[in-house]
């Protein structure tokens, strides 16, 4: 039995039949940042494409890299052949084809595979090697797909490729919950699924009883679907959804409303205090026995007003679990590591003080200086004297470096772990709960980031050799701070997220509406959606 996502199943197929794919041994799979960074490193190849500016907007290299990634991901998942686009008379379409071809060449040359390519490579393998497909079909007799409304074109092709002549395919989904169009998903797949079979072959079983939501919420939902259909919204659902009326499993015995309003008149401090009082009131009344029974839903957990609320609650003793809020670089353990690492390279710090780095914005300068201030403040404590002296010795060594060291940047970080507070953090027992483990998890993620940087830039030691008039150690030290970490800081990086425990004990959860799908909480607080939907 195969159980997993489309991507995990495709990756398994690729690994089991690697010799038939276009990949070589030890291929590397790119995450979203790796993909953008790879394009960024090769941006000159894309900019050399004729009529490149008709397909990609005229902006900085990093933003162009992100735009290119979006384009090639969408084209790949639609199984578009770059040669077909390149032959088009429209110069923009032809340029898109060239962009896709250059991108595919980069992946091939470096034995790389991005997230989208996991599915396209599996599809290519199965359609080009009938024996492999036949072997797979002999193993897979029945296929069940959940959340079918969130599938895209290539996933639909894979489903029917796997299904073969058996056609034992069961899909479950709700066309009214198609939330992932922005990722390429299409509700067309579930709406038109019965049409893929001969008359009478496909049995449709309506599931209209809602066992999860309060009847007030179900009634509101049904009314909303009626309200949005017609002249008032200038829209007709018709072919865009299956006609249905959802029924609640039962009517509540209580006559009190399931939804209450908690708000303030554009006063952020009052808003914070009301939410705190609301949570504390639930605790004191006994209705709340663990903070993990509450979820806060937002359009974005990265918004400044959301992160301010998180900091306010944490300052009042209520832990917040929000791994995708991109607060990774604001965590004290990460700021301290960065600050201590910088202090070991005095020449870099001098350049920072003199604002010599043209690619850093005022925000980056403020952040890095803040990290150094945090480090100096910690090291000024007499109890940190050994750590302070060690950093000073390293800084003096690197300033006057005469011969290559036997360590790189990651090696320095690992050496730092001998000292408090890092030694204390990393010695935390693994069974104390996710919140207490968060600093250790974040430190582990940071070491992974630096290790990946060294791998991508082929750095293993600190080298004093001169290249183009400057020491390599000085050039290389600027790259992680002024480029790699800067881009990660700008793009955001999620903290450690435990898939086995989506609502860790002792924490209120801050989630996006998309992120919360499929989860259940006794108490849900929904942030204002502003003026949408109108």
Give residue spans per PLM region:
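ATPase/helicase motor core of nucleic-acid motors
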Residues: 196-199, 257-259, 284-437, 447
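Walker B catalytic acidic pair
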Residues: 147
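Accessory C-terminal helicase-associated subdomains
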Residues: 93, 112, 287, 385-515, ...
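Phosphate/oxyanion-binding active-site loops and adjacent basic polyanion-contact surfaces
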Residues: 35, 111, 115-118, 213, ...
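Conserved helicase/translocase P-loop NTPase motor core
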Residues: 3-10, 94-142, 152-158, 274-281, ...
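Inter-lobe coupling/hinge region of RecA-like P-loop helicase motors
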Residues: 23-29, 105, 201-212, 230-298, ...
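A basic/glycine-biased coupling hinge at the interface between accessory DNA-binding modules
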Residues: 1-120, 138, 167
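Conserved RecA-like helicase ATPase core segment
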Residues: 153-262
